[in-house]
């Protein structure tokens, strides 16, 4: 197979990019020193996290000048995410660190007054030359496709400015802000989105770059769709609770208020519900059109050496065939390995990222960290798992999984915690409640409400909230809409609605009656009652913008 070189400086999930490159017929070779660059033909610069950190790494490693020389030589160069951002002059994220300066513009942070930041999800990358009569686009981009973005800073688009200098520009819109989603000129191609996480649409752009196929025509049908299909889609996430069953097999299971053991039928008497094999099910949901796949390791494999964790192999195998974001939760904490070695949470997360994860989800440890944060007078320690991982990989890499439950009171004055007036009073007629945080899979409650928790972890650097609800788990009665609006009002970071989905209508309700950024389903998919594709079609039929699954490249 022909080869392409990757610069081996970057933190994060490079495995998925390697798998995507292999998928489109190329092999990867690594650039491990600046001197290697002189012999490179095609170069890809991936990147995640902090602009200043990435540019500082490139500078201290002696790579900046060789990269400039590679670009100036006319040989193919592709930048991905921070790899794109590195081409600009500077960024608000770290004003004192200069970029490569290839593109005369500056990156700015998204305005969080009207929307969640980071911008996470599937959005457009539409060539600015396309209009209702058709046109051309570059490197396989399609105005009818969606691509996966995850970033807080972007290059604002100013019509015609870069085009005057010969740049081809594709844009996306987030709220009222239009920004550069992809850009190309001569031998340079760069994307703010992650092609390796953008399904077949992303694989198509990778192949076009590697094959040198810069321009192609857009069909009239695609150009007509451009305006009506532009913008961020409604994300549908498939979640797989993974654990070992009683005979040692790794299985996908599903609980009823977090109880995963059978209560009736042939397996009554406490057998762990076995709903399938994790890798096979993840691939199935990807092919149904899932926008993300989340693995929640609900036993954390406590007696297994860290390097041999079964979840690492699940991620490695899944990332070979699933080209959408993968999140892993469970066991992301400071731990002691079986040989007595102390392993920091950052090292645990790094193993998951190197195995194919894009995000890690932190649960009980986030509650303890929040308690310590308030006890210290809202002073950050810099030592929590959330802080250390987000500093190294960016806040978009850290999800906090929240497991609250309702506590009813007669009036708000009966508790120090933040309450809501609910439309669903309890049997005693109390119509006020607060949401109490729990740990250890819901088995232990803490004197902390859900708003306190999410605001604390946002301050620590979490980039997303996975909002479960113990009262709704396994109920198939719909999401807790009151809880979701309660939490959305408390933070600026994106929130994923979880717990309670039993039919497509529940997804319509949560997107219509809350401002949630995504919605997650589990049991209804595992049991085969509905597919992810059926949920998306239901939403699309009712006017919601969703990503359509595209067939294999």
Curated annotation (Swiss-Prot):
Residues 3-223 form the Glutamine amidotransferase type-1 domain. Keywords: Amino-acid biosynthesis, Glutamine amidotransferase, Histidine biosynthesis, Hydrolase, Lyase, Multifunctional enzyme. Pfam families: GATase, His_biosynth. Coiled coil: none annotated. It catalyses: 5-[(5-phospho-1-deoxy-D-ribulos-1-ylimino)methylamino]-1-(5-phospho-beta-D-ribosyl)imidazole-4-carboxamide + L-glutamine = D-erythro-1-(imidazol-4-yl)glycerol 3-phosphate + 5-amino-1-(5-phospho-beta-D-ribosyl)imidazole-4-carboxamide + L-glutamate + H(+); L-glutamine + H2O = L-glutamate + NH4(+). Its EC number is 4.3.2.10, 3.5.1.2. Residues 232-553 are annotated as: Cyclase. Signal peptide: none annotated. CDD domains: GATase1_IGP_Synthase, HisF. Pathway: Amino-acid biosynthesis; L-histidine biosynthesis; L-histidine from 5-phospho-alpha-D-ribose 1-diphosphate: step 5/9. One of its GO terms (molecular function) is imidazoleglycerol-phosphate synthase activity. GO terms for biological process: L-histidine biosynthetic process. The active site is at 81 (for gatase activity), 194 (for gatase activity), 196 (for gatase activity), 241, 403. PROSITE patterns: GATASE_TYPE_1. NCBIfam families: hisF, IMP_synth_hisH. IGPS catalyzes the conversion of PRFAR and glutamine to IGP, AICAR and glutamate. The glutaminase domain produces the ammonia necessary for the cyclase domain to produce IGP and AICAR from PRFAR. The ammonia is channeled to the active site of the cyclase domain. In the C-terminal section; belongs to the HisA/HisF family. This is Imidazole glycerol phosphate synthase hisHF.
């Amino acid at each position: 197979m022909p080869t392409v070189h990757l610069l081996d400086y970057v933190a994060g999930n490079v495995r998925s990019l390697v798998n995507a490159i292999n998928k489109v017929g190329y092999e990867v070779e690594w650039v491990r020193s600046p001197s290697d660059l002189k012999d490179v033909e095609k170069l890809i610069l991936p990147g995640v996290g902090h602009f200043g950190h990435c540019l500082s790494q490139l500078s201290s490693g002696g790579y900046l000048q060789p990269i400039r020389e590679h670009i100036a030589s006319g040989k193919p160069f592709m930048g991905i995410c921070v790899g794109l951002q590195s081409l600009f002059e500077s960024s608000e994220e770290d004003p004192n660190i200069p970029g490569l300066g290839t593109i005369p513009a500056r990156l700015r942070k998204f305005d969080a007054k009207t929307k969640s930041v980071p911008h996470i999800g599937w959005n457009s990358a539409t060539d600015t030359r396309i209009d209702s009569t058709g046109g051309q686009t570059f490197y396989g981009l399609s105005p009818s496709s969606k691509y996966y973005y995850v970033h807080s800073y972007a290059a604002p688009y100013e019509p015609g400015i870069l085009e005057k200098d010969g740049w081809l520009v594709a844009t996306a819109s987030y709220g009222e802000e239009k920004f550069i989603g992809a850009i190309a000129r001569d031998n340079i191609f760069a994307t703010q989105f992650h092609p390796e996480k953008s399904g077949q649409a992303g694989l198509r752009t990778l192949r076009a770059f590697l094959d040198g196929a810069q321009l192609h025509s857009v069909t009239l049908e695609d150009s007509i769709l451009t305006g009506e299909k532009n913008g961020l889609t409604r994300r549908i996430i498939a979640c797989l609770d993974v654990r070992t069953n009683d005979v040692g097999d790794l299985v996908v299971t599903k609980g009823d208020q977090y109880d995963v053991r059978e209560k009736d039928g042939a397996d009554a008497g406490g057998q762990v519900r076995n709903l399938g094999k994790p890798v096979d099910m993840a691939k199935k949901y990807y092919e149904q059109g899932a926008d993300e796949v989340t693995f929640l390791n609900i036993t954390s494999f406590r007696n297994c050496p860290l390097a041999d964790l079964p979840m690492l192999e699940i991620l490695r195998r899944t990332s070979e065939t699933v080209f959408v974001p993968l999140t892993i939760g469970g066991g992301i904490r400071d731990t002691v390995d079986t040989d007595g070695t102390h392993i920091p949470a950052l090292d645990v997360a790094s193993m998951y990222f190197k195995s194919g994860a894009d995000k890690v989800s932190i649960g009980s440890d986030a509650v303890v960290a929040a308690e310590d944060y308030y006890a210290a007078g809202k002073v950050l320690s810099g030592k929590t798992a959330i802080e250390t991982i987000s500093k190294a990989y960016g806040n978009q890499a850290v999800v906090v999984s929240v497991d609250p439950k309702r506590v009813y009171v007669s009036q708000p004055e009966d508790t120090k915690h933040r309450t809501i007036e609910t439309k669903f009073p309890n049997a005693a007629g109390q119509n006020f409640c607060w949401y109490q945080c729990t740990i250890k899979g819901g088995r232990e409650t803490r004197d902390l409400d859900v708003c306190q928790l999410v605001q604390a972890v946002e301050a620590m650097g979490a980039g997303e909230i996975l909002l479960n609800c113990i009262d709704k788990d396994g109920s198939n009665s719909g999401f807790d809409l009151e809880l979701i609006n309660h939490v959305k009002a408390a933070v600026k970071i994106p929130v994923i609605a979880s717990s309670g989905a039993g039919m497509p209508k529940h997804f319509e309700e949560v997107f219509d009656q809350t401002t949630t950024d995504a919605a997650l389903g589990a049991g209804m998919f595992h049991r085969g009652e509905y597919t992810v594709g059926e949920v998306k079609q239901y939403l699309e039929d009712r006017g919601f913008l969703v990503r359509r699954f595209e067939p294999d490249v």
